Amino acid sequence: MPGGGPAMDDYMETLKDEEEALWDNVECNRHMLSRYINPAKLTPYLRQCKVIDEQDEDEVLNAPMLPSKINRAGRLLDILHTKGQRGYVVFLESLEFYYPELYKLVTGKEPTRRFSTIVVEEGHEGLTHFLMNEVIKLQQQVKAKDLQRCELLAKSRQLEDEKKQLSLIRVELLTFQERYYKMKEERDSYNDELVKVKDDNYNLAMRYAQLSEEKNMAVMRSRDLQLEIDQLKHRLNKMEEECKLERNQSLKLKNDIENRPRKEQVLELERENEMLKTKIQELQSIIQAGKRSLPDSDKAILDILEHDRKEALEDRQELVNKIYNLQEEVRQAEELRDKYLEEKEDLELKCSTLGKDCEMYKHRMNTVMLQLEEVERERDQAFHSRDEAQTQYSQCLIEKDKYRKQIRELEEKNDEMRIEMVRREACIVNLESKLRRLSKDNGSLDQSLPRHLPATIISQNLGDTSPRTNGQEADDSSTSEESPEDSKYFLPYHPPRRRMNLKGIQLQRAKSPISMKQASEFQALMRTVKGHEEDFTDGSPSSSRSLPVTSSFSKMQPHRSRSSIMSITAEPPGNDSIVRRCKEDAPHRSTVEEDNDSCGFDALDLDDENHERYSFGPPSIHSSSSSHQSEGLDAYDLEQVNLMLRKFSLERPFRPSVTSGGHVRGTGPLVQHTTLNGDGLITQLTLLGGNARGSFIHSVKPGSLAERAGLREGHQLLLLEGCIRGERQSVPLDACTKEEARWTIQRCSGLITLHYKVNHEGYRKLLKEMEDGLITSGDSFYIRLNLNISSQLDACSMSLKCDDVVHVLDTMYQDRHEWLCARVDPFTDQDLDTGTIPSYSRAQQLLLVKLQRLVHRGNREEADSAHHTLRSLRNTLQPEEMLSTSDPRVSPRLSRASFFFGQLLQFVSRSENKYKRMNSNERVRIISGSPLGSLSRSSLDATKLLTEKHEELDPENELSRNLTLIPYSLVRAFHCERRRPVLFTPTMLAKTLVQKLLNSGGAMEFTICKSDIVTRDEFLRKQKTETIIYSREKNPNTFECIVPANIEAVAAKNKHCLLEAGIGCVRDLIKCKVYPIVLLIRVSEKNIKRFRKLLPRPETEEEFLRVCRLKEKELEALPCLYATVEAEMWSSVEELLRVLKDKIVEEQRKTIWVDEDQL
């Protein structure tokens, strides 16, 4: 046939075109098929229909080049594509059987479940014979399972009896423990009361001594004033007497002056005296002249007369002398008289003064006697009141002891009655178990046909117990054998369970890594299964991986629910299909999962299918579940709390860049872009570099999609646009760390667009520096630790403390999820010793562990108050169980856990609890911040839409915005040449310390800031235009304020500005490029008495300590570091001032590290 060749070729081409058309329909839906198809379910049926052989099946299921389920499904479609039309028909029949929705999506037809291919291959008789053989095998397996179930039930009953006995012992021990704790609490409360009473007594004694001293000082002052008054009175009296004496003397003188002769009389007497003297002289001259001329007789007469005259003169002289002597005696007598008069007046003055003093002292003695009588009356009244108070107090103590004794007796009686009641209940339970065993023995169960067991026993066993499945024991915390009274008197006992059974039931939570559409489909599927759960009993071994069908079936995980749904219908028979199915359902490990295990951050981002297979965080998180239940909360609530705590962790690695944006920074002809499939892109290329040098392609897998897209070694990646974890995002890669770039490329799916440029020079420079040992990667940034890291406990090589600053050199050191970092010298910024620390995500887990230890501490002696708080929260949460569940978005238990977690955060944030519980190894710094760290604005906008969608659906959304677990804070170094201002905390000590520093010879180094005095209007205007560091209202219309210019003026003088403001102004100062030195003076119970001289006003020690701890808590939110003056560093005020000066000098030399995210 010469013309047959072209016709046959046309026919073959037509068949090929038809096959290609059929497979094009499948390829159009390849994404959905590879996403939902499980190759392990289809390969038995495909092998039964002889479409694939054992080699193909082994390649699909076990090839190391196919790490994920999507890759395996894609490979299976490629193999079926090579089988032509037959492969297409058999593939559609398998979809019709296993995935009717996907069959309808591909063909647009409803599934009919008629399988012509297997009938054609085997024939009706062969198929019937094969099915009968399989049914017989299954029946035999069911019988064996039933026998095993009966044995397990008997053993379970025996274990339950032992459990009841242990529960009884446990309840007794808990009762005694509760009594012990209660008595311990009473003792502690009494001790606290005693200490408080002692303190009050001490304060009263101090107050009494102070008042007594003040009273004595007042009495002494009163006495001094009284003496001064008496002296003034005495002086007044003396002056009055002197005044009277002077007045008398002045009157006598006045009388003498008045009685003296007048001037005319004196002149007249003087003229008479002159006349007499003239006459005498005349007479004498006449007598002498007469002597010469008189005769002798006359001379004799004259001599006689002269003689008589001389005698008369002598007599007269004697009389004159006598008169003079008498006058002298009179004068002396008058002098004596005057002297005696003066003495008399003095004596009279003294007498009157003494009389008045006597009257004054007499009055004072009377006043003192009256005061003494009043004091005696007050003393007698005080003694009487004291005796009455002591009598009343002793009576109250006697009554209190009597009531306490009665309470203790009643409590003991109550405990004994409770123990007796528990014992009786235990006896009842034992008798009931014995009765059930006897009824079982009398029932004559046929062990050879266990499927004929009574329906009641089967319902009891299937309803509450589950066999061991997949090496895992189901939850058997409650059985149908327990009476209603058991739950009333026996405390709930939660045995230790594996993490897989307690993983978060996330189906009712809208905010999930799976899409909303998938969640709704899973809910619909689970409602369908729930409708048939009463009629369905899965006996096939293929269902061994699913959870038991119980009332809580709707709370299973999505992947497990899907597995159970798919195991409802019977599997098509095939060689070793059951064994292969069991192996397929078992958790297997692939290369991606091994990579996830090696990189801790991948564990944070597992999808819902694999999310429950791996423990979240370090083992210490999961091992604490047993201690959780001792607090009285059930395991589900605690698991919800753990899930909510995990929601605070970042969904992406740490991003240190503050300049990265959602656009290509280097626009121009050098920037190129390519579009390729992002699935498995991370396996096609390797990356090199980091945030400091850029992300470069180090190698490209030959023949891969990346190579065909034009990506080569040395290309610098700039921007990635596409679907990342189900969200359309635009991520800049030029400023990403090595860890973040790898994470982004590993999480992308579908078509993505990569912007890159050829930068061989930068790539060669990076390689050369790495070969020379100058750098280890392209990462370089500085972080401040917010928790303590121990090299022995946290699986790293470097031990660091909270607030240490390190230089991160590599975010994926040796391709592991560890950061290589160097300790930074605080003075020179040089790198010191190097080592590894946990990555950001693992550090979040460590921080979470410390918070969980803080909350769920089992040692009650360390956390009695935490125990009471959790118990009170437990009691508060009880009414939440009655919430309505009509809204599918609301879960009562989730609301309960949310409310509990909100109260828990308040409990953790209280400074008193933190200081009681945090030791040196558990110190953490809880700060508020953006969950994405320093993410750029465009990246925030990209995630804003998703946040708005889930804002109403997420019950923890508001809680998530209030707290972010930030183990590392990105910091930036600043250097200050000028002297920095100084702030003191507690602020109440600032004024005293500033004055003492200035008075202790520090005026050359320190000074206070001169404030501006402005009016109210000027102050309001200044508030709007300038940054006010400190302000104070002097009077209703005048304000005193300090602005940064005032502080800079002090710094210009090369002096430290001592501020009395609080630490709330630190952010404003840093924003103004002024970097203060913050000094914390540590206050504790041991050194609180040393601060009495420093406090401006007297305060109680408890109030002062509480305020100081609140101030210490505020220091955690500061964007910069602070210096601490410990209590052991000083013992007196002088030593404190010396230590403060040394600290200021030391801090001035240090580098300033600022967390700009906290500004």
From Swiss-Prot:
Description of the deletion phenotype: Impaired activation of NF-kappa-B downstream of T-cell receptor (TCR), leading to defects in interleukin-2 (IL2) production.
Ranges for domain PDZ: 672-760
Domain Guanylate kinase-like intervals: 978-1145
Region called Linker, residue ranges: 111-128
Gene Ontology molecular function terms on file: CARD domain binding
GO BP term, pick one: positive regulation of T cell receptor signaling pathway
Functional note: Adapter protein that plays a key role in adaptive immune response by transducing the activation of NF-kappa-B downstream of T-cell receptor (TCR) and B-cell receptor (BCR) engagement. Transduces signals downstream TCR or BCR activation via the formation of a multiprotein complex together with BCL10 and MALT1 that induces NF-kappa-B and MAP kinase p38 (MAPK11, MAPK12, MAPK13 and/or MAPK14) pathways.
Domain characteristics, as noted in the entry: The linker region, also named autoinhibitory interface, is less inhibitory on its own than that of CARD9. The linker region together with the inhibitory domain (ID) are required to prevent constitutive activation and maintain CARD11 in an autoinhibitory state. Disruption of the inhibitory domain (ID) region triggers polymerization and activation, leading to formation of BCL10-nucleating filaments.
Protein name, as recorded: Caspase recruitment domain-containing protein 11
Species this protein is from: Mus musculus (Mouse)
Lineage: Eukaryota, Metazoa, Chordata, Craniata, Vertebrata
